Amino acid sequence: MAKRFLLGIDDSQYTFEALENLAGLFLKSDVHFHLFLAVTESHLPAPPPTSSEATDWQEVQKRRAQQILDKGVSSLLQIGYKRSRISTETRLQSVNAAQDILNGGKSEEIIAIVLARKQQSGVKRLLPDTTTANIYQYADVEPVWAIGNLPLKPPHVLAAVDESDYADRIATHLAETLGPLPDVRITFLNVMPAKPPSYWDDGHILDKEERGERKGVVKEWQWTYEEIMGGIFAKARGVLTKSGVPEERISTKMQTRRSGPARDILAEVSRGGYNIVALGRRGSGDSQIDPGSRASKIIRSARGCTIMLVN
C-alpha cells in the first residue's frame, strides 16, 4: 500500500524548499504526496480596484490558489515523480487553516502531515507560525513532520524516548516511513529522570548509616529504570530491523540528566550531527505542547533539523 504524505503548502519559499527536500528523500520509494492549500482571506491579494463583481473576485482567488498548487506539482515532476503520485486539494476562504489541514489529514488516510519549518531568529523564533503551532497542538492522531533546511539525505535520526508508550509509536513510525531507505541511521536516546524526591528529601540530614542505606535504594531504583529502558530499546530495535534497517545502523544511548531533558537532548543533537529529531507529543511528564514542555523547547531550538512529532 502506498504511503501518502499530506503537505500543507503556501506560497512561501520555505514551503517549496521543504517539498523538494522531502521529495528527494522518497523519490525511489512508493510515496505519494497530497498537496493541501488552505487559503485564508489574509493570504490573498487585495481585490483589484476595477473588480465590481463578487464572482470575478472568487475567480481571482481560485486562479491564485491553482498557481501555487501547480508550482508544487511542477517541482515534484521536475524531481522525477509521476503525476499519478501527486494529488492536490484547495480550501478557499478558510477560517482556520490549521483545522482544515488536520481534517484533510483524517480524510486522506495519510502517514503524516508535513509542514515547512520557517526558520526565524531572535524573539520571532520563540513565537512559531500560528498555523504550525496549532497543528502541533491539536494533531492528536496523525504524526506531524516539520521540515528543516538541513538536507534529509542521508537521514540521521535522533529519537528521544522515555519509559512511556511513545517509544513504541516512534519506532513503528520510523519503521513505516524511513525503514525501507538504504542509508538511514537511527539513535534512540533516553535521558534518565532525576531521582524522585522521596529518595533524597527526608526532612532531615541523613546520618552515616542512613546514607549507606539510601545509596543502596537509589542504585536499585537506577537498576530497575535501566532494565525497563533496556527492554524498550530492545523492542524498538526489533521493530526497525524487521522493517529492513540493518542492526549496525541502530544505536541506543542512555545518560543521566545534566541540564534538563530538553537541553540534554539538544546537546546530543549538536554533538551527533543529526538532521531529524523524533519526539513523542506527550512524554511521561508532558500533557500537551505548551510553551514550557520538553517537546516545545526542542521544536524551538533544534535549528535546521526536521522535527517528527509522533502522536
Please report, for each region that a protein language model flagged, where it lies by residue.
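Short, solvent-exposed amphipathic alpha-helices that sit
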Residues: N21, Q61-G72, D100, E227-A236, ...
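General small-molecule cofactor/ligand-binding pocket signal
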Residues: H34-F36, S87-R91, W145, T187-L189, ...
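A short acidic, glycine-rich active-site loop
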Residues: A54-Q67, G212-G231
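Extended, hydrophobic interaction surfaces within ordered domains
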Residues: K62, Q66, R83, S94-V141
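Structural beta-alpha unit
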Residues: S74-I113, G238-V277
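Short, flexible loop segments at boundaries between secondary-structure elements
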Residues: E142-L152, I299-N311
